[in-house]
Each structure stands twice: as C-alpha cells, then as structure tokens.
C-alpha cells in the first residue's frame, strides 16, 4: 500500500539531514529571542541567492519574507492583498487551504479546471471564461498538489499572458519545486513575468525533510 497522503516525510522514515540537526543544536542558544519581522537575515539572504540561481527577475532581500510555513504565508497573503468580494481563480482539484484562506479573507474562490485528459494541465479556455470584473488573482500550484503535474514553459507563458491581459496577481505555490524527477525541469512562473505582481511561495519542509522544525 502506497500512502499518498499528507506531505509529512518523518513518519515514513525520511529523516532530516544530520547537518540540520547539528546546526539546530549549535544555534539553539542564539535563537531565543524574536527575529526581524521579515525573518532571519541570513536565511533571507540564502533565499535571495536561490532566487538568483533560478533566475528570478528583480528580486532583492527586501522582497523576501519568511514564516512558519507556506500554509501560514498563504493565509497572510490573502489577508493582506484581498478585499471583500475579490475573486481568485484556484485550480481544481486544489490544495484545500487555498480555497479556505481566500474565503477567510473575504474573497471568493473560483475554481478552474485542470484536465485529467490533458495531463492535468490547467484549461486556459476555462480560466479565461471565469474572469470577471471582480477577479483579482490566479493561483497556480506547480509542481501540482495533488495531481503531480509539472507545467511546461509554453503553458506557463499562456497563464502569464492571461494574467497580463487582465491585470491579475499570480500566486505560485512551488513547495515541490525540488522534487522533480525523470530529467524534467521546474520553471518558476516569476521568471516569465518580470512585469507582473507575482507572489512565489516555497519552503523547506518537503525538500529538506524538516516539516516539524518550523
């Protein structure tokens, strides 16, 4: 039986690297107080360097915020960037927290189809048909949870063009970007949209097996 459920590596014997355990112990005494409101500077600097490796455009350390995990940051983004009644396009099937966080912030989740017959890719025509005067943003999850689909550059460019034409914020959930197999490559959508407002959400809990360390 393959348990394809919650993305929690530890119960399935995927342990955190020894380097993480060692550094946690060595830095425990220096970590008793509050950090900067945006997060620990050295961590944000490391994220900035990762963004540079992935060719994110125009990203500086001042653009980077850290939190207790992507789930919490999704909720904070919705609270900060949505007004009551704003509509947000969300993939279906989706990661349920997106729908819940949008509703909690007073927004309205509007689900667009990811087509099982087309490798679970977003249906661009369906996305376009659901845009109204209240549409504020579009969510993409790439690599996708729960389908596992990895979106090619051509599809991402189509999504960017829809966002560009309709002045939409793009929320891109990329928590699984380093768990790509079979020689495929993950492309951050922000690298294709230097002129748009893109919020990229990522973390270490899956790729570094540290879900409980947050």
Where are these regions (language model features)?
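Helix C-cap/helix->beta junction micro-motif
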Residues: 105, 165-166, 196
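Active-site PLP attachment segment
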Residues: 192-214
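Conserved PLP-anchoring active-site segment centered on the Schiff-base-forming lysine
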Residues: 80-102
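N-terminal small-domain helix-loop-helix segment of the aminotransferase-like
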Residues: 1-69, 76
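Short acidic capping loops at alpha-helix termini that bridge into adjacent secondary structure
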Residues: 58-64, 84-87, 134, 195-198
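A short helix-loop-beta submotif of the ANL/AMP-binding
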Residues: 104-110
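Active-site phosphate-binding strand-loop segment of PLP-dependent enzymes
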Residues: 110, 115-184
